[in-house]
């Protein structure tokens, strides 16, 4: 058991609360210690405290909880000297809140300098992950398991353990012949049908959705943005230009270039609008939409590049360093105006379907401010439209720690007055893949002597990262999405330690290449959840003990009922129909008993015409 010394030196809130005392929580404790704060105004609060936690065993967490709601909490980073811990999103009713520390390990925790601050809104925190590969992994026979080795649905399991946002990446037409000439993405996955299905799984599990348009048939990043094959065909059919022909690209006139850019912008709008409309029709409107993936180099090369570059004619990838084939390469002139055309077309399409969806522009190399200021200064100068700045942050590639990432978020959010989301992060829990070879993330020098590539090292890195991002000034960091939590090793029974899952398929022999992230996922080589899942579980925002989420399409309303209590709850979904004169013409009442700490989905058919949906959650009636 952990020994907890909790010194409540002062509890300061924006309203004046007469509360200041020192409490010595010493001796063995079971499950932690807490204190109740009273005489509070109802509303939302953030909690901070300085915490010393020298033990790496298990997880310990600072929390705040009020009657009728689950706890908001943050896992304590390992720190012998003390670190400021931030808990966001505590919801208070009945004028009181219990604050405390929970633990499942051994050691000593000291807590001091506690502040409970009233806020004007619930400052929640997104702690999500990329779920795009789940259907692909399951098709290969991969299984996801809980901590005890029981098979689970990864969406439901991760949602129940604190993951609240699913990233889903859409590639246009994956399959043989649509990659870079050497590799391709497997057909039938990451395409429209698959991503719509993944979105439904995410919503049914109670997750929000961050939807990424790759605008490519293949992996896209800062050096590779290949125009989708169907768009290439459309441009050739409608304009007569072959935008995959290197000789044409190197000889086209400025008028031809502008004509193609305008057509691409039109295609971007129509494609984005169509996919967004299909998401809306099935009740899975994304909360956040990313236009492209890591587009620091631009989009739809060579028509939207951010700097002068060359692209090889075989793989359509930017060339860096000693270019031995410079005379044959495709020239990619800097063209910010073209990029902004594409961004604004995508933005307008998203907003035409869902005004509430926030549009993200996502770059790599998060924590390196100069790369972002160069990019967003140009976007703003040219009138690009976006709502949120997205950044990938990998310690192995940026060689910056989580504190530096926090300071980067502070600087960039203040300069551009935009919220920030960390779109990707990852860390090794094993030095190599299962076959003994290195994965794509090499251990970062910045954490070399702090967090080794072990399960414990991974857990401690995640705890530090979550806490640092929660402490970004004015809560302007929305949260963080992990890449990739679910692209797990799937054992090849004919080739020991090799994986059936891989990052891409070879054009030459149609064999899957290696899985470069299998030693960074949130499940181990056998598919079993790793300890870092507990960091998600104990780093959450408050929600109602019986939490209700509804989605609807044209024919029915689907209600997800999440019972976060230790007893069975009876919940009723009531649908009232109205005629054209607003007179009630029908009532449906569907009740469901939901067992303790589980979730159920209730589906009710919608009547023709107007309707209203109400939910009785066991204690109050809620209009949805």
Placement of each model-derived feature along the sequence:
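Aromatic-rich peripheral "rim/lid" segments of glycoside hydrolase catalytic domains that contact
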Residues: 308-309, 318-319, 407, 411, ...
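Glycoside hydrolase catalytic-domain groove-lining segments
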Residues: 154-155, 354-359, 366-447, 457, ...
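Boundary/entry segment of secreted carbohydrate-active catalytic domains
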Residues: 121-157
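Extra-cytoplasmic beta-strand recognition segments
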Residues: 25-27, 33-56, 83-90, 113-115, ...
């Amino acid at each position: 058991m952990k020994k907890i010394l909790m010194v409540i030196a002062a509890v300061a809130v924006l309203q004046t609360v007469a509360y200041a005392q020192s409490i010595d929580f010493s001796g063995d404790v079971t499950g932690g210690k807490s204190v109740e704060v009273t005489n509070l105004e109802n509303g939302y609060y953030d909690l901070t405290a300085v915490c010393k936690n020298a033990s790496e065993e298990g997880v310990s967490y600072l929390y705040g909880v009020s009657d009728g709601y689950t706890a908001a909490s943050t896992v304590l980073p390992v720190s012998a000297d003390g670190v400021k811990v931030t808990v966001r999103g505590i919801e208070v009713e009945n004028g009181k809140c219990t604050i405390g520390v929970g633990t499942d390990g051994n050691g000593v925790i000291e807590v001091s300098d506690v502040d409970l601050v009233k806020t004007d809104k619930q400052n929640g925190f997104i702690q999500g992950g990329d779920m795009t590969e789940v259907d692909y992994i399951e098709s290969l026979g991969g299984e996801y398991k809980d901590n005890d080795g029981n098979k689970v649905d990864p969406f439901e399991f991760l949602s129940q353990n604190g993951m609240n946002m699913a990233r889903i990446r859409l590639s246009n037409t994956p399959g043989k012949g649509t990659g870079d000439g050497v590799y391709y993405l497997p057909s039938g996955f990451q395409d429209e049908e698959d991503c719509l299905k993944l979105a439904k799984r995410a919503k049914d599990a109670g997750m929000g959705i961050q939807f990424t348009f790759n605008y490519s048939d293949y992996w896209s990043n800062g050096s590779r943005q290949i125009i989708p094959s169907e768009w290439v065909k459309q441009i050739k059919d409608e304009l007569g230009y072959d935008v995959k022909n290197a000789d044409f690209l190197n000889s086209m006139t400025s008028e031809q270039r502008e004509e193609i850019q305008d057509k691409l912008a039109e295609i971007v709008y129509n494609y984005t609008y169509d996919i967004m409309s299909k998401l809306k029709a099935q009740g899975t409107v994304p909360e956040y939409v990313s236009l492209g993936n890591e587009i620091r180099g631009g989009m739809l090369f060579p028509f939207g590049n951010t700097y002068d570059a060359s692209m090889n004619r075989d793989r359509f990838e930017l060339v860096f360093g000693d270019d031995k084939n410079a005379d044959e390469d495709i020239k990619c002139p800097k063209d910010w105006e073209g990029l902004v055309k594409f961004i604004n077309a995508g933005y307008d399409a998203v907003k035409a379907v869902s005004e509430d969806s926030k549009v993200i522009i996502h770059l790599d190399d998060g924590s390196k401010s100069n790369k972002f200021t160069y990019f967003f200064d140009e976007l703003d100068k040219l009138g690009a439209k976006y709502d949120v700045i997205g950044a990938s942050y990998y310690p192995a590639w940026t060689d910056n720690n989580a504190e530096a990432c926090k300071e980067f978020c502070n600087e960039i959010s203040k300069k551009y007055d935009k919220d920030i989301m960390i779109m990707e992060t990852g860390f090794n829990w094993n030095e190599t893949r299962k076959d003994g070879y290195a994965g794509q993330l090499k251990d970062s020098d910045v954490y070399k002597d702090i967090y080794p590539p072990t399960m414990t090292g991974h857990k401690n890195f995640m705890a530090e990262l979550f806490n640092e991002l929660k402490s970004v000034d004015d809560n302007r960091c929305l949260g963080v999405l992990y890449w990739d939590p679910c692209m797990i090793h799937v054992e090849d029974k004919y080739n020991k330690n090799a994986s059936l899952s891989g990052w891409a398929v070879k054009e030459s022999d149609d064999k899957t290449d290696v899985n470069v992230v299998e030693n960074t996922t949130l499940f181990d080589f056998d598919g079993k959840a790793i300890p870092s899942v507990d960091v998600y579980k104990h780093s959450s925002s408050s929600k109602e003990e019986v939490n209700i989420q509804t989605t609807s399409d044209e024919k029915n309303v689907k209600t997800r009922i999440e019972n976060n209590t230790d007893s069975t709850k009876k919940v009723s979904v009531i649908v009232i129909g109205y005629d054209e004169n607003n007179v009630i013409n029908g009532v449906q009442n569907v009740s469901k008993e939901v067992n303790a700490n589980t979730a159920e989905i209730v589906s009710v058919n919608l009547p023709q015409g107007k309707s209203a949906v109400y939910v009785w959650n066991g204690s109050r009636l809620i209009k949805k």
